[in-house]
């Protein structure tokens, strides 16, 4: 087992990885920008190394600085967390080339699944269904028009290297195809340094269902059930729950088995998530995330398994201790993503947290790096807390989440807590009758 792990991330996810390491008796090294010198993960780590100025490109996205910090601290392994360099194949290779263990899948699998066209082809060969779309990138305008016509409008234009809704646009009629593609190209280049696009069929009312998987790299594979991430705004997840209120036992068992079969055939190592659109009883693969997900606590709450510990153990070369029969999913879990944003305009709200009180009680978990006196930086993602609750069933879970939201105090900045209170009182949410467009079409958000 590792003696010392460098955590190449910040905020609540860095703190989450730190806690898992502590539980395993592993020392931690925090890296931070100058803006994060007082961050909680820095305060709690055994060691910390400043890796650059506030801008992410000069600190948390600076692979060379992170490697230098690992050398200075004498770390054995590097955990990339979520976002930043967690799905960067070149960084994974750099980590291994310098003699450290990358806590994640192989660079080959990161690269394979990072290219959405390649990923769809591979997944299709493995027997999972995909959304109808182009077999290759949309090159010239004429080629794009032909592809869209063959697929049938409406279509969705997507960045090959994309994620998080960036470089993506819906095209309802042929006249707007080229202008939407131009916008998506510019956004993709700015976000990912790659303006390659592809086109696929736009589904009108799908749910977003994802399956949490693990592989040992030698053909062993397990899954932890599904999560429903359909409450979204501009392709960004707002609320996640597990299990999905839309699936019956047969559909749940089928997609879990098919996902683990794909992991087994890929000989995939570590944590991964297969994301699907689900419409009219059919699943359609959209992408595989080759890392831990922000919403992983939902799966932890219904399974009782620490997924970060599983990541670390597999990366250390230990045999996968769990088999599918060992994973018993109980009750229901919901996660509300609390962002430092105005709850109506969604304008960012950085600033000083003048008062902080987290909710508690049975079945309540808060993953946050906030504390009274902490200053929320304008330089990074606005997510400041994940409020997760677990109960015996969905109705009790909703009641518990309402109670937890009422207890939660974050003063000095605006947050989306009022939005979550509203959503948990909406009739469609209470009945489980929603899709990925619901938040925008029904509530106009």
Where would I find each of the regions flagged by the language model?
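Diglycine-centered glycine-rich loop/turn motifs
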Residues: 107, 132-133
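Catalytic core of soluble alpha/beta enzymes
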Residues: 133, 141-143, 147, 174, ...
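A polyampholytic, Gly/Pro-enriched intrinsically disordered region
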Residues: 122-131, 153-154
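ATP-dependent carboxylate activation and anion-phosphoryl transfer catalytic cores
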Residues: 7-23, 48, 71-73, 89, ...
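ATP-binding N-terminal substructure of ATP-dependent carboxylate-amine bond-forming enzymes
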Residues: 1-126, 138-146, 396
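N-terminal nucleotide-binding beta1-loop-alpha1 segment
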Residues: 159
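Acidic/histidine-enriched active-site and ligand-binding environments that engage anionic O-linkages
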Residues: 147-156
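Structural detector of well-ordered beta-strand residues that form the stable sheet scaffold
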Residues: 29, 79, 101-103, 131, ...
């Amino acid at each position: 087992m590792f003696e010392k792990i460098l955590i190449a991330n910040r905020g609540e996810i860095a703190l989450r990885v730190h806690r898992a390491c502590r539980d395993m008796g592993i020392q931690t090294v925090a890296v931070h920008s100058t803006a994060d010198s007082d961050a909680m993960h820095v305060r709690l780590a055994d060691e910390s190394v400043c890796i650059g100025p506030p801008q992410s490109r000069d600190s948390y996205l600076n692979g060379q600085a992170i490697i230098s910090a690992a050398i200075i601290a004498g770390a054995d392994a590097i955990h990339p967390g979520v976002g930043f360099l967690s799905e960067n194949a070149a960084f994974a290779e750099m980590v291994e080339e310098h003699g450290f263990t990358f806590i994640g899948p192989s660079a080959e699998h990161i690269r394979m699944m990072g290219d959405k066209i390649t990923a769809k082809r591979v997944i299709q060969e493995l027997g999972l269904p995909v959304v109808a779309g182009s077999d290759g990138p949309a090159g010239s305008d004429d080629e794009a028009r032909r592809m869209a016509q063959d697929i049938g409008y409406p279509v969705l234009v997507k960045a090959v290297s994309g994620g998080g809704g960036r470089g993506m646009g819906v095209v309802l009629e042929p006249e707007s195809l080229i202008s939407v593609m131009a916008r998506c190209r510019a956004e993709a280049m700015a976000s990912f340094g790659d303006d390659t696009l592809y086109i696929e069929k736009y589904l009108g009312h799908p749910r977003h269902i994802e399956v949490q998987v693990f592989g040992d790299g030698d053909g062993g594979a397990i899954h932890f059930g599904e999560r429903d991430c359909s409450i979204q705004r501009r392709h960004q997840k707002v609320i996640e729950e597990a299990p999905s209120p839309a699936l019956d036992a047969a559909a749940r068992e089928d997609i879990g088995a098919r996902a683990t079969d794909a992991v087994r055939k890929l000989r995939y190592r570590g944590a991964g998530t297969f994301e699907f659109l689900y419409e009219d009883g059919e699943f359609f693969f959209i992408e595989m995330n080759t890392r831990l997900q922000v919403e992983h606590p939902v799966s932890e709450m219904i399974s009782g398994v620490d997924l970060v510990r599983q990541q670390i153990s597999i990366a250390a070369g230990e045999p996968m201790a769990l088999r599918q029969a060992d994973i018993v999913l109980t009750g229901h879990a919901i996660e509300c993503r609390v962002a430092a944003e105005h709850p109506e305009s969604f304008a960012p709200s950085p600033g000083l947290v003048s008062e902080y009180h987290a909710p508690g009680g049975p079945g309540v978990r808060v993953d946050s790096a906030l504390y009274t006196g902490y200053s929320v930086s304008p330089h990074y993602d606005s997510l400041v807390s994940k409020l997760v609750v677990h109960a015996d069933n969905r109705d009790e879970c909703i009641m518990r989440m309402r109670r937890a939201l009422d207890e939660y105090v974050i003063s000095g900045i605006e947050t989306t807590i009022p939005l979550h209170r509203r959503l948990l009182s909406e009739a469609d949410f209470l009945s489980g009758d929603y899709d990925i467009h619901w938040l925008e079409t029904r509530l106009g958000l």
